[in-house]
């Protein structure tokens, strides 16, 4: 019988799995590696894992037998049906109190279901977001675990040891119950979509209106990366824009302008609609990728549909132009994160989760794709007030957006004048203006709904009267002259 020496079992030896195993071994943990294809295990042990505290398993039974109790088994395999299949194979060999960790990109409703099913069987289940890509897995990812709280004391040391560190603090903390870990990872990915789209719009404005070369744009991003916009995505954009092909021309300009997506941004946008949250920037970022995908249609439209042209002298003050653009990017980024945390807040309320908001912001400060110095202020905001309703109610962020507002508006106006699409910048500003409006035209919208569908409406308290009572659903015959008013409970 195999000796139980493993601290962690890991199933799935694609690059992410291998790198996470090597990371754990570097931190003094003994890892048992398993893959359905035995040759992958053998190759890994003979090469990258050679000489490290990594042992192989030849079967599910062998994997389980080599792990210390309570057994901790992490899955880094394709999301969906393969996870369910593997869990079914694992469970008969486990004891109550053993721990299964799904580290893949699972959709949170699936994690909720697995959590419920395994809890009934006495198995502790953790759904953990893992961000940072291949390098993150190897040298320190952002980890977002949630699920069975009883599992946390058993996996905390491993997770916080292998996680990225920000100012000495691990970018890993317990998120909350059920599928909350994967939910937070989903929102992280949605914010990532938004950040990337904002950066692309800034690039497009500099290129098409400012007529900057790629090298000049790279220099702008390099400068921005020393200030409030310092982040991983700004850093890699700088590097991409100065990368030349073998002919000396920028490689980025040779890439087809059709962006792919794996679906996590779409999940975030759909969930925002389900919960009634105006997470507009992530939604526009998803739609921007969809628009990019219809390349042939866009080519035909470019020959048929007229629009303004950009004159050579569109920009008279390049320094002011770049400053305004920086302010637009910064303010829009604040809106994106404010919307993301609004969604997390509403999810906690709707799903009955108690979430650790300060820890969520901290987890994103290092190791992950959206890591940035900006997140330090979000962490501080939620540490100062864990129940903060919206980031825009925090003094730092309210002041930052107010200061950036003029440049933000000028940038969007300039882009609109010359026909440059800015869906993310524009929706961020539209949200800001809507959010700060005490009164919106939804009064007319609700009257329209009542006119054609008897959907009823409510009266403003200061406008209440005997025939228009407050706190009542009211329907009116709009084809008359103010008569035929009746209360109704009809809703649609």
Swiss-Prot record:
Keyword set, alphabetical order: Gluconate utilization, NADP, Oxidoreductase, Pentose shunt
Highest rank taxon of the organism: Eukaryota
Chain residues that bind substrate: 105, 131-133, 188-189, 193, 262, 289, 449, 455
Organism per entry: Saccharomyces cerevisiae (strain ATCC 204508 / S288c)
EC nos: 1.1.1.44
Note: Present with 556 molecules/cell in log phase SD medium.
GO annotation, biological process: D-gluconate metabolic process; pentose-phosphate shunt, oxidative branch
Enzyme superclass (EC): oxidoreductase
Gene: GND2
Pathway named in the protein's UniProt entry: Carbohydrate degradation; pentose phosphate pathway; D-ribulose 5-phosphate from D-glucose 6-phosphate (oxidative stage): step 3/3
One GO cellular component, as annotated: cytosol
Annotated binding of NADP(+), by residue: 12-17, 35-37, 77-79, 105
Classification via Pfam families: 6PGD, NAD_binding_2
Record-annotated active site: 185 (proton acceptor), 192 (proton donor)
Cited NCBIfam families: gnd, PRK09287.1
Organism phylogeny: Eukaryota, Fungi, Dikarya, Ascomycota, Saccharomycotina
Keyword Lipoprotein set for record: no
Catalytic activity: 6-phospho-D-gluconate + NADP(+) = D-ribulose 5-phosphate + CO2 + NADPH
GO MF term set: NADP binding; phosphogluconate dehydrogenase (decarboxylating) activity
Keyword Lyase carried by entry: no
Protein name: 6-phosphogluconate dehydrogenase, decarboxylating 2
Family the UniProt entry places it in: Belongs to the 6-phosphogluconate dehydrogenase family.
Subunit description: Homodimer.
